[in-house]
A protein has these predicted regions:
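Arg/Lys-rich, intrinsically disordered low-complexity tails that mediate electrostatic binding
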Residues: 1-37
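N-terminal mature-domain region immediately after signal-peptide cleavage
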Residues: 23-33, 38-294, 301-307, 312-346, ...
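Domain-length cofactor-binding catalytic modules of enzymes
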Residues: 350, 357-361
Length: 528
C-alpha cells in the first residue's frame, strides 16, 4: 500500500493550495500583478524608504500586491530544493534559522532584524521564513558543519535523529563525497569582470559586469530590482538585484549612493566555517554604511563566518574634485574572502575577474576541497589537486572554473583599452570552450549552459542535462554608478531562451523538476 508523504507544516500553511496541480508554463520572474518593469522584461521593481520596520512592511506588501502567490510558490520550490539536496524538508531549515540565526541577527543587527520583522508583517509570513530567505546562501556552509553545532548538550535531544543520520554519513566515505558534491554545486555561481584605468577601459573609468548562474529552481526568484532609501542619517541609499523578502542582493550586484558598485563570485569547494555573523547582514551593512573601499573590506572581515565565501569586488568612482579636476581617482578592490585567509588588492589601473576560484593559493589549497573525485572536479571545479593550481580547478580547462578563468583573461586582454559596458556584455555571453578548442555553449563556458551538456560538466553536479545555467546579466560604468543605476538583462546572457517543456521532452529524467521550473524567454535590457 502506497503511503502518501506527509506535507511539511510550513507547506500546508503556505504552499499553493493545488500543490499537485497540472503542469502549467511559468515564466521565470513572472508576476501575476504584471509588475515586471515594463516591456515584458520580467523585472519586478520595488522602492522602500523610511525606518527599518516601515520599509520592511512596504517591501512585503509590494511583493504581495504584484503577485499574491509569490512567497507561497517560492517556499514550495525551496522545500523541493531542500528535499533534493539534503533529504530534509523546509520545516527543518526553519528550525535551524530559529535556533542558530535569529538570535545572532536580533542581537548584532537590530535594524536589519526590524526590517525583517516588517517584511514578515507586510507579507503575512513568520520571521523565520524571512530569515531563511536571507541565509539561504549560507545554509550549505553551515550544513556541512552541522554536527559541530547540534551535537551539544543544548541541542542533542532535539536533534537526536539528525545527529544519528549525520554520524552515519560522516562514517561512510562514499556518502560523504556525494553530500560534498551536492553542497559544492550550490557554491559554484557567477562570472564577473571589473576594470578601471586608461590601460583597460574606454574612458578610464570603472566598468563592471556580472552574470549569475544556478539551478533554474531558485534562479527564477532573483528578478527583484530593490531600491532602498533609509531614513535621514541612517546611511546611504542603494539599488540592487535581489529576491522577494531580501534585505541584501543575494546574487550580489548593487550600486550605492556613496558612488560604490559591488559584486562577487563564490569560491567553489570552500569548506571552512565558523558560526558568527551571516553574510547577508555583513554585506548589507557595507552597502548602507560603507563610504570607502577600505570600510567594505573591514566590515566583511568582522566576525566573518566563511559562509558564502566569495571573491568580492568593489569599485569607487572617486571624487570630481570641483572645477580644478582634483579629487580621488576611481579605484577598484578585490577581496578574496576566506575564513582564516583573506587577500585584498586595489588598483587604479587594472582588471579583476571572478570565476569561482581565487588567485590566492592559501585559500585554494587550505580552505577549499581537494579530495573529491575527478568527476566532481570536472563538475564543480572543487576536486583533485590540479597540477599546482590548488584544489579548485584553477588550471583545469576541462572544468568550469579553469575554462572561464582562461577565457576571461584572454577576452579582457583582447579588449584592453576598449572595455565598456557593450564589451562586457559581449564577454559575458561568450561560448568558447578552451578544452574542446571551439565554440560550444556548455557547462564550462562563460555563458554557462549546463542544461545542454550531456557530459555532466561544471555547475551541474556531475549530472548530464541538469537544469542549470546563466540566467541574467548586469553591467555598470562610472556614469551609471554616479546616477545610482545599472543596466540589467533577465535571461541567459547570450539571449538563448530556456523552455521547460522542450527540455522535458528531450530529458524526461528531470520531469519531477518540471512543476517547480520556469521558462527563461529572450528578453531586453532595462535600466535599474
Amino acid at each position: 500500500m502506497k503511503t502518501r508523504r506527509k506535507m511539511p507544516r510550513s507547506s500546508r500553511i503556505y504552499r499553493h493550495k493545488n500543490t499537485q496541480r497540472k503542469r502549467t508554463t511559468r515564466t521565470a520572474g513572472s508576476t501575476a500583478g504584471g509588475g515586471g518593469g515594463g516591456g515584458g522584461t520580467e523585472w519586478l521593481r520595488i522602492t522602500i524608504r523610511g525606518a527599518p520596520y516601515e520599509r520592511g512592511v512596504s517591501h512585503g506588501k509590494q511583493i504581495i500586491a504584484a503577485d499574491p502567490e509569490r512567497f507561497t510558490y517560492m517556499f514550495s520550490v525551496y522545500d523541493f530544493l531542500f528535499r533534493q539536496g539534503y533529504g530534509r524538508d523546509i520545516d527543518f531549515f526553519y528550525g535551524l534559522c530559529e535556533d542558530f540565526y535569529l538570535g545572532i541577527i536580533k542581537k548584532r543587527f537590530p535594524k536589519i532584524f526590524k526590517e525583517m520583522k516588517g517584511i514578515a508583517a507586510g507579507a503575512k509570513l513568520r520571521v523565520c521564513q524571512v530569515i531563511l530567505i536571507n541565509v539561504f546562501m549560507s545554509l550549505p556552509y553551515f550544513y556541512a558543519h552541522l554536527l559541530r553545532y547540534i551535537d551539544t548538550p543544548k541541542y542533542r535531544k532535539k536533534y537526536a535523529d539528525v545527529i544519528r543520520d549525520e554520524l552515519a554519513i560522516a562514517a561512510n566515505p562514499a556518502a560523504l563525497a556525494a553530500r560534498s558534491r551536492r553542497l559544492d554545486e550550490m557554491k559554484d555561481r557567477c562570472s564577473l569582470v571589473m576594470a578601471v584605468g586608461e590601460d583597460w577601459t574606454k574612458d578610464g573609468g570603472i566598468v563592471c559586469g556580472h552574470s549569475s548562474f544556478s539551478n533554474f529552481l531558485d534562479a527564477q526568484f532573483c528578478n527583484v530590482i530593490l531600491r532602498i532609501e533609509p531614513e535621514a542619517g541612517d546611511g546611504v541609499p542603494m539599488v540592487m538585484q535581489s529576491v522577494p523578502g531580501g534585505i541584501y542582493s543575494m546574487t550580489d550586484f548593487f550600486v550605492t549612493g556613496a558612488g560604490i558598485v559591488g559584486s562577487e563570485t563564490t569560491i567553489s569547494g570552500f569548506n571552512a566555517f565558523a558560526l558568527r555573523d551571516p553574510i547577508c547582514c555583513r554585506i548589507r551593512e557595507c552597502m548602507q554604511y560603507g563610504r570607502t573601499l577600505e570600510e567594505y573590506a573591514e566590515r566583511l572581515q568582522k566576525r566573518n563566518s566563511g559562509d558564502y565565501a566569495c571573491s568580492w569586488m568593489f569599485g569607487d568612482v572617486g571624487g570630481h574634485g570641483g572645477h580644478g579636476g582634483h579629487g580621488r581617482p576611481p579605484r577598484i578592490m578585490r577581496v578574496e574572502l576566506g575564513l582564516n585567509y583573506v587577500n585584498v588588492e586595489t588598483t587604479k589601473n587594472g582588471v579583476f575577474l571572478g570565476f569561482n576560484s581565487t588567485y590566492d593559493e592559501r585559500i585554494r589549497n587550505i580552505e577549499c576541497s581537494s579530495s573529491l573525485s575527478e568527476k566532481a572536479n570536472h563538475a564543480t571545479g572543487a576536486g583533485a589537486i590540479d597540477g599546482g593550481g590548488g584544489g579548485s580547478g584553477f588550471r583545469d580547462v576541462s572544468s568550469s572554473i579553469g575554462n572561464r578563468r582562461v577565457q576571461l583573461e584572454k577576452l579582457t586582454e583582447k579588449y584592453r583599452g576598449r572595455i565598456d559596458t557593450d564589451v562586457v556584455k559581449r564577454i559575458l555571453s561568450d561560448h568558447y570552450d578552451n578544452h574542446l578548442g571551439k565554440m560550444a555553449a556548455n557547462s564550462r563556458t562563460v555563458c554557462k549552459h549546463a542544461y545542454a551538456d550531456g557530459g555532466g560538466g561544471g555547475g551541474g553536479g556531475g549530472v548530464p542535462f541538469k537544469p542549470v545555467g546563466a540566467y541574467d546579466t548586469k553591467v555598470a560604468d562610472s556614469a551609471s554608478i554616479r546616477r545610482m543605476s545599472f543596466l540589467a538583462h533577465w535571461g541567459p546572457p547570450c539571449g538563448t531562451p530556456f523552455s521547460v517543456r522542450e527540455h522535458m521532452k528531450k530529458h524526461p529524467e528531470w520531469k519531477d523538476w518540471a512543476e517547480y521550473l520556469a521558462d527563461f524567454p529572450k528578453r531586453g535590457w532595462v535600466e535599474a
